[in-house]
């Protein structure tokens, strides 16, 4: 009997309130790194109706107009009208940053196990994942969920569907047969819109047609769409009130959207607003880099990496590889190859992936992984041939 199951992942648009917060936090980080890439940054953001609160810990020599950075980010997303719930020109922006604790800084500056190296900025566990379901070596449900909300923004910004507003969510339910993607069972797309697209609580018929034909169908592989595929477009109907007016937004609340859509475990640490001495971010990027190179090398069809750290200690507590039976050599041997070819100490990660750069705002919407952006060094597969040769393949 075929191993037939359904698996679902979701994504949210750049105008979703939590993603607005993430993008502001990473825009702050980038603005600081443009002047002082050795800064320590933990920038948190809250968004609500007409209000942005910036808080956290920042130690830097940079001089940044944090309020203007927040406004510019909100403008770029498309919140330029008070009818949308927040307007970059008129919203209140409150700033409440402290400096990084000296107690934390001493352990990061000089690792207890290697005084010349950088210690991990906190304890914790991180996961990386890759699989052969898509050319980008990402799970198909999260990959296509991202592409749906990304296209929503494109159609909104270029004027092809001018009734769209910034807030949106997508969800893709994939049917698997024999452990491989077979077809799409259900697509959910909810998007904020201008008032004339609804009659009472219901949407006008042309709205459904435009979303299905212009937004959804161009994104998804035709071979995965069947007569049984369900389209749920704005299933609750009217969606005029959205963004920070519809829900309070906070940095770090979309960690599954940011990673693999639930296809592998998550260590719990968010990414946005954090400089790369925080292993929550940098080690998760490194784990993706490792996993992707293992799959690209043909050592496994899917690969999950777990790493863990202790605060102030450079070397990871463990590097564990799981290939779920798809590996061509034992997982323990793959783990030894990882230790030999990747420096997963915090300083090693920062150097390996060139992370002391203002590259982070782009990561804060549409996923940190599975995107072939030139700044996303963790998406390179430059170690694949080395790993393949070392494995004797």
From Swiss-Prot:
What keywords are assigned to this protein?
A: ATP-binding, Cytoplasm, Magnesium, Metal-binding, Nucleotide-binding, One-carbon metabolism, Potassium, Transferase
> What lineage is this protein's organism placed in?
Bacteria, Pseudomonadati, Pseudomonadota, Betaproteobacteria, Burkholderiales
Q: Which family does it belong to?
A: Belongs to the AdoMet synthase family.
Q: Where is this gene product found?
A: Cytoplasm
Give the residue ranges for region: Flexible loop: 100-110
PROSITE patterns associated with the record: ADOMET_SYNTHASE_1, ADOMET_SYNTHASE_2
The protein in question is named: S-adenosylmethionine synthase
Q: What class of enzyme is it?
A: transferase
Q: What is its EC number?
A: 2.5.1.6
Part of which pathway?
Answer: Amino-acid biosynthesis; S-adenosyl-L-methionine biosynthesis; S-adenosyl-L-methionine from L-methionine: step 1/1
């Amino acid at each position: 009997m075929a191993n037939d199951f359904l698996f679902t992942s979701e994504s949210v648009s750049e105008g979703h309130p939590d993603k607005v917060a993430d993008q502001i936090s990473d825009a702050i980080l980038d603005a600081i790194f443009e002047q002082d890439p050795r800064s320590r940054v933990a920038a948190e953001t809250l968004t609500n109706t007409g209000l942005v609160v910036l808080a956290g810990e920042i130690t830097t020599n940079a001089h940044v107009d944090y309020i203007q950075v927040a406004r510019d980010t909100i403008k770029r997303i498309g919140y330029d009208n008070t009818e949308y719930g927040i307007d970059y020109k008129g919203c209140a922006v409150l700033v409440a940053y402290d400096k990084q604790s000296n107690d934390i800084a001493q352990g990061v500056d000089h690792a207890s196990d290697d005084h010349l190296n950088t210690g991990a900025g906190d304890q914790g566990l991180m996961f990386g994942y890759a699989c052969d379901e898509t050319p980008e070596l990402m799970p198909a449900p999260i990959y296509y969920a991202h592409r749906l909300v990304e296209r929503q923004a494109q159609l909104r910004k270029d004027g092809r569907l001018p009734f769209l507003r910034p807030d949106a969510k997508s969800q893709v339910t994939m049917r698997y047969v024999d452990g491989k993607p077979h077809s799409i069972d259900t697509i959910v797309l909810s998007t904020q819109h201008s008032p004339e697209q609804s009659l009472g609580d219901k949407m006008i018929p042309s709205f459904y047609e435009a979303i299905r034909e212009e937004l959804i169908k161009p994104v998804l592989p035709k071979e995965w769409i069947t007569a049984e595929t369900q389209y749920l477009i704005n299933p609750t109907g009217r969606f005029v009130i959205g963004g920070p007016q519809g829900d309070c937004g906070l940095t770090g609340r979309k960690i599954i959207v940011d990673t693999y859509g639930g296809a592998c475990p998550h260590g719990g640490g968010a990414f946005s607003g954090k400089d790369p001495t925080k292993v929550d971010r940098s080690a998760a990027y490194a784990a993706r880099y490792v996993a992707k190179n293992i799959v690209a090398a043909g050592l496994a069809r899917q690969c999950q990496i777990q790493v863990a750290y202790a605060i102030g200690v450079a070397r990871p507590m463990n590097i564990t590889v799981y290939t779920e039976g798809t590996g061509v050599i034992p997982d323990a041997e793959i783990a030894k190859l990882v230790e030999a070819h990747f420096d997963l100490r915090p300083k090693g990660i920062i150097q390996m992936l060139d992370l002391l750069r203002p590259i982070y705002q782009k990561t804060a919407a549409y996923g940190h992984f599975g995107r072939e952006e030139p700044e996303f060094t963790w998406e390179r597969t430059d170690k694949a041939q080395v790993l393949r040769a070392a494995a004797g393949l």
